[in-house]
Swiss-Prot record:
Pfam families: ATP-synt_ab (PF00006), ATP-synt_ab_N (PF02874), ATP-synt_VA_C (PF22919). It comes from Renibacterium salmoninarum (strain ATCC 33209 / DSM 20767 / JCM 11484 / NBRC 15589 / NCIMB 2235). Produces ATP from ADP in the presence of a proton gradient across the membrane. The catalytic sites are hosted primarily by the beta subunits. F-type ATPases have 2 components, CF(1) - the catalytic core - and CF(0) - the membrane proton channel. CF(1) has five subunits: alpha(3), beta(3), gamma(1), delta(1), epsilon(1). CF(0) has three main subunits: a(1), b(2) and c(9-12). The alpha and beta chains form an alternating ring which encloses part of the gamma chain. CF(1) is attached to CF(0) by a central stalk formed by the gamma and epsilon chains, while a peripheral stalk is formed by the delta and b chains. Its EC number is 7.1.2.2. It comes from the Bacteria. ATP binds at G168, G169, A170, G171, V172, G173, K174, T175. The lineage of its organism: Bacteria, Bacillati, Actinomycetota, Actinomycetes, Micrococcales. Belongs to the ATPase alpha/beta chains family. Its main location: membrane. SMART domains: AAA (SM00382). This is ATP synthase subunit beta. It is found in: Cell membrane. Gene3D superfamilies: 2.40.10.170, Bovine Mitochondrial F1-atpase, Atp Synthase Beta Chain, Chain D, domain 3, P-loop containing nucleotide triphosphate hydrolases.
Amino acid sequence: MTATATEQGARTAAATGRIARVIGPVVDVEFPADAIPGIYHALTAEITLNGATHAVTFEVSQHLGDNLVRAISLQTTDGLVRGAVVTDTGAPISVPVGDGVKGHIFNVLGQPLDVAESEIQYTERWPIHRKPPSFDQLEGSTEMLETGIKSIDLLTPYIKGGKIGLFGGAGVGKTVLIQEMITRVARNFGGTSVFAGVGERTREGNDLWVEMEESGVLKDTALVFGQMDEPPGTRLRVALSALTMAEYFRDVQNQDVLLFIDNIFRFTQAGSEVSTLLGRMPSAVGYQPNLADEMGLLQERITSTKGRSITSMQAVYVPADDYTDPAPAATFAHLDATTELSREIASRGLYPAIDPLTSTSRILDPQYIGKDHYDTAVRVKQILQKNKELQDIIAVLGVDELSEEDKIVVSRARRIQQFLSQNTYTAKQFTGVEGSTVSIKDTVEGFTAICNGDVDHIAEQAFFNVGAMDDVERQWAKIQESTK
């Protein structure tokens, strides 16, 4: 292992100060006038608590004047006292990069959580604060990333090298869908994946680790966690740590990279907490005044450059199912495709609970996905929209009062809704049914058949939680057999 110039510079530039004030995770430190650390510099101090000594790291956020800097702690400050010595490392927080990080879990500081640090083989560390690629390095993409999930591939096709958002309230299936994407896309991808666990449940992180190990994708994946029980500074920076690892694979190794972030809302929430702790005046709904700026600093680095890409899938919690909330609203502008999960669809047991009418994609256009695919997607949306408009009439007067034409629309819409459901590999442990992967060709043909009325004779329940139309016909044969 070799030290980088950054590490050598940190040792020669080391300056010490003393803690003047501690308020939870916020620490004010006094330094000599000629050795004030720069913004984003990492500071370290030793804490002795219950007879054990450990290091705690801070990040400089503000210069207060009078030789004072205000820093945010990235670990608990229990046991920290006024007058304690703090050392300026002379550089921002940095994380290990390269092939050595694959197959391991790290914290925000790049310290491995599954093995001893000496077992991680790396030759370089990169600072987590980096500039985005310059404009002339960027390269747009319209190539479709096939997932094998019918509702996504048909109605909100994902873009290779694009940014994809999975929006939804609590308990509608965001994390399950992210885990499903890891299983499906990473398994068939062949490149490197990086997962950022931002402010989510530790249990889910453990489940993901076990699942990735069993599915064989762990060896090509680096995981970086800053979970719910971590200080806000950690939750704010952990996405940057993971992104830095992904950037190395893109820029140095010229790889196509998958970046999964769960959950972007927790990143925003941590920024709000840090902003309040720093004494900034809150903005709309209590969020930080620099919300758009913070989101932009992260999202602008998640991009594709000439010849290589970072494809990002981000789960976004929607507070109280309110899509006008500033946190999800700030995320929307950066995305190429949005998949919105509906509580109403989830309540009917239709998973993945994707809302086909509100989900969008930049490449849902005949010049990118082909005329047949586009025409079928439009017809499906038209039928579902017409069915939605008829629901008020049905609620008051009943289905029998509809015209024959409207009855056909409702009947086909119900088949489409059932056919949009699909067994997933992640949910096998709960359902006992193996997941299914459907090609885009079979998906388009299946929904075209429903729209044309070719399968009006098949009962609705035969379309529930199946793969392609062949599975529907097998299911229908079983239903007929059981009713004889």
